Structure formats: C-alpha cells, structure tokens
C-alpha cells in the first residue's frame, strides 16, 4: 500500500476529475503521520499527496502538491532554502447551531452560555450566573467569565499528543472565541499542522458536547476569526528577513512584502476563500482591510512583530482566515513574495498610525489599496493577476480555472442569488 499508493475516485471531489478519467492515487507521506487520539481502535492518520496516473506526475490540482512545488520553486530560484510559516488560528466554540436553507426560509442561530443575548435566560436548575465577556470584551478574561478554559487546556494536551507544540492559547476578543497557535514549520509542514489543529479543536469540542467552527464571521457586531500567518525565508541557516532597514528588516524582506501587498487583492482568493471572509474584513474589529504595513500595529494588514534577535525577523500577515486551504494560501503568499524580490517591488512607507480611524477620502488621498469587499471581486482580481502564481509551474492554468469555477458556482452565485433575512427588513414593505 505504501509503495504503490491507494487508488481512489477523484471525480467525487468537486473541481477535480470527470467520471471518465476518475482514477487517481494517494501516495502516503511516511514522515507525516500521527496516531488518532479520538479513534476507539488504534488508527494512524497519514498525510498524502495525489498522483496523476494519466500524466505520471503529482496531480496539479492537489493543494499539498502545489505547496511542495512552491517550496521547491524557492530552492530552484536560488532565493532561499526554506520558507517558514506559522499560523495563529482563531475559532469559536458554541453550545449549538441551527441552520435552515430552504426556498421560503433562510436562517441560522448559534448559541453560547457566554453570549450577551443570554443575560436573561435561565439555564440548568433555573440558574444564570451572569458572568459574560460581552461584545468585544473577551480578550483573556479569567473564569468564570471565560467558560472555555478547560476545553482549551484539553485541546493543548491533545495537540501535544499528536506532535504539535503550542506557544499561545487564550480566550479571544469575541464571545465564545478562542485561539491556539502552534510552532512554525516549513510551508508544507505548517499547512499540515493547520489541518491537524482544526481536526483536534473540532473533535475536542464535539466530545465535550460543543461545536467548534473556524468560520471567519459567525457573529454580527463582534470580532471574527482570522488565521494570522507569520512568514520568514532562510538561506544557509540565515534569516534573509533580518537587516538594517525599517525595524531591523532587510531589503530582501521589504521586497518580499512589496510583492505580497502588490498581489494581495488577487491573493485574497486563496487567503480569504469564502463569501463570509469579507464580512470579517471591515474596520473596527481588529481585521485589517487596508493594504499597508507597520511595526506592532494591529490595524495594518501586515504587522512586524517585536523581536529581540535576528532570527525572529518576520512578517505577520493579518488578513488570512481559516476558510482558506492552508496549502494554497501559504503557497500563494510565497509566490507573491518571491515575485516582489525578483522585481524589487517597493512596499511603500510604513504607516504607524491607527488605520481604522482613516476616512475613505483619506485612504484615497494617500493612494492606499484596500482588500476586496467580496469573494467575487477577489476571484476577478486573481484571474487578472495570475502570472506570478504560474512561475515554475507551481499553480497551473488548469488548476486556476478549476478553482475559480468551483468558487463561483458553489459559493458566489448561490450567495448572490439567495434572499437574505435582512433584505426583508429593508425591502419587504417597499
């Protein structure tokens, strides 16, 4: 099995193969596996790549294979030996969720004991203890306001069991929201770790009678969940982002940043991959939409974290979220950064101000670009700016077309055509 791979039906995955050419092979990665901590019997979870039996090569629509090609392209270009990524994934843990999607009815309802909407509710034995973080009031409270500390502790223990080292875990700003960050790794390893993290968080919540989601914006009027992504590039065991320019960065780093900012509007098709993503990217909720950079400034879309050593020089890209496929998101970020280095793209001046306070007129006057406001727009921007993705045959034209078609048909068109409950408030009595 490990030598010959595992055959499967690729036509069962949307956007992949037609039924007439559906045979593909899963090739296990024998250095990337873990014992499933939730299985009743001993089970091993193995990360796999997809092999194309028709072209006798890694499948060009396999996200993990694309991530591997991006890392190899970095090496082949001579620009670096390895790109390190580290993700901070935010999530919500709710007590329950109800969803209805019918022709005559559209609604959802999530619930959490922490929710401010439950201030007047009687819980078990008629008791309501009253300790709640409130909207945007949940950053690092202690119990009893923080009702999820024990669940997060259990998450960390299980993550350690499956080989992930955590460096940050706490209640986040929103009600019922948490965050766990795991140690960085190379591009592919970091993407594997995101998948592993999401599995563990969802399963621990499930076994505690809760439901976890990495959806970017499940609550109106409260902060959303991002996937802040830390990046650095190394060569000959040296951090190429360390230098003598702004905040200890190198020219290489600033050009890398210039590439990401230059391509960010199309890059969002991979880093912010859902229609819901763009409800998070609005001012006032610590989710940056203005494409600029700054040191220690969480209103900028790119933050330069404080570091005491050259090895810690890195960027924190704050716009991505966990609706993205991490293999595609990380690969696209690397490709954009490499394009910036090759073409010496200037990122412009840093903006060390609270960008959330800028008016639209001020943003226009300063010539600052913003993130797209919809998934449709990000896909259109990606299609108009895709050549950098295709360098080194990392993202193929066939993959790009399949990806945009899937996103339009499965998400954009249905979202645009469905009546929304809020429209009945604004329009029903017209």
Model-derived segments and spans:
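Accessory "access/gating" subregions that flank catalytic or transport cores
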Residues: 136-167, 180-187, 198-214, 262
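ATP/Mg2+-dependent ligation/transfer catalytic cores
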Residues: 1-171, 364-430
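Short beta-strand elements
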Residues: 105-121, 125-127, 227-235, 291-293, ...
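Conserved structured core elements
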Residues: 64, 85, 149, 153, ...
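Catalytic-core signal marking the mid-to-C-terminal active-site face
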Residues: 200-204, 210-213, 234-430
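Glycine-rich tight-turn/loop motif centered on a GG-T
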Residues: 107-112, 137-145, 183-192, 238-247
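Histidine-centered divalent-metal-coordination microenvironment in nucleic-acid enzymes
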Residues: 88-102, 171-185, 215-237
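A generic structural motif
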Residues: 51-58, 143-144, 184-190, 237-239, ...
